[in-house]
Amino acid sequence: IIPKQSGIKVSGHNRSDDLFMFIRKKITGLSPGTQYQLYFEVEMASNVPTNALGVGGAPGESVHLKAGASAKEPVVARDNQNYYRINLDKGNQSVGGADLINIGNIGVTDTTTAYTLIQRSNPTPFSQRTGAEGELWIIIGTDSGFEGLTTLYYSAIKITLQK
């Protein structure tokens, strides 16, 4: 998903105990209407320590990394309570949903203060069906309960698909 020798910065200040930040990419050329097993390998730079205290939750363990896929394009829209929501089932914070699973958190180590590369992956496959034209949207994001600023840099994302 990410070109070699670059990265993607995501940053947000969570003020409501519920912030979802995500990146997405459409994959085409797959078999139409076919069930695929997906394995995600995400490398990112995080400067967040583990076992730290924070408002709403720990800045490391309360920011959950999620990965998923959908035949439906992920978009954000206002709901009937005037909140912006993604149109997919991402679950909530540590719990995955039908379209995204939890693959870990953004905590590095107890003594972290500098940005450090961390890797997260799913040991068991995530299953999703492609659309009628063989398309699948890949979504990687963080679902945060930590009420504060989170800034991350995605440096590599590898997705393996198996029929």
What kind of feature is each model-predicted range?
Residues T34-N51, I140-T142:
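A short beta-strand element within beta-rich, extracytoplasmic domains
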Residues N102-T124, I138-L149:
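Short beta-strand-plus-loop segments that form exposed binding edges in beta-rich domains
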Residues G134-K163:
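Proprotein-processing/basic-patch segments
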Residues M44-E61, E73-P74, F146-L149:
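Extended, low-complexity, turn-rich repeat/linker tracts enriched in Gly/Pro/Ser/Thr and Asp/Glu
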Residues H64-T111:
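Beta-strand-rich interaction/scaffold domains
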Residues R15-S31, L117-P125, Y154:
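Short beta-strands within extracellular/lumenal beta-sheet-rich domains
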Residues I1-F22:
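Surface-exposed, low-complexity/disordered Ser/Thr/Gly/Pro/Asn-rich loops and linkers
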Residues D18, G29-Y39, E133:
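Extended extracellular/luminal ectodomain segments enriched in beta-structured repeat modules
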